[in-house]
């Protein structure tokens, strides 16, 4: 029976995302657990086009975009020390973390 912990990190800023990934990887490696990653997942780009003028000049438009960067970390066969180390990691405010526990029975 092998358990896995999957950690998905999302952020608009890839610098803070990479920093958070390094902190998690170093915390897990201190507990001597095996970790796969960071695996860069495809970034999602949302583009918005709006008119510059509210009345005329339809051809004058502005374009904005939001880039969402993602990383995946997989911890194989975690022990309680890994969970304790992950709970103590302090991450940046702009990084969203989703943790999934997967049990392989």
Curated annotation (Swiss-Prot):
GO molecular function terms noted in the UniProt entry: structural constituent of ribosome; tRNA binding
Matching Pfam families: Ribosomal_S10
Transmembrane regions: none
UniProt record similarity statement: Belongs to the universal ribosomal protein uS10 family.
Any single Gene Ontology cellular-component annotation: ribonucleoprotein complex
Lineage: Bacteria, Pseudomonadati, Pseudomonadota, Alphaproteobacteria, Rickettsiales
Assembly behavior: Part of the 30S ribosomal subunit.
Identification of the protein by name: Small ribosomal subunit protein uS10
Biological processes annotated in GO: translation
Keywords: Ribonucleoprotein, Ribosomal protein
Role this protein plays: Involved in the binding of tRNA to the ribosomes.
Listed InterPro entries: Ribosomal_uS10 (IPR001848), Ribosomal_uS10_dom (IPR027486), Ribosomal_uS10_dom_sf (IPR036838)
């Amino acid at each position: 029976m092998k358990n896995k912990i999957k950690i998905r990190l999302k952020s608009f800023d890839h610098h803070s995302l990479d920093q958070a990934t390094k902190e998690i990887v170093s915390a897990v490696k201190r507990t001597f657990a095996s970790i796969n990653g960071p695996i860069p997942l495809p970034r999602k780009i949302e583009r918005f086009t709006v008119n510059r003028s509210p009345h005329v000049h339809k051809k004058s438009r502005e374009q904005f975009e939001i880039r969402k960067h993602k990383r995946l970390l997989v911890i194989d066969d975690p022990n309680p020390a890994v969970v304790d180390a992950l709970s103590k990691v302090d991450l940046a405010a702009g990084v969203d973390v989703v943790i999934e526990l997967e049990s392989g029975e």
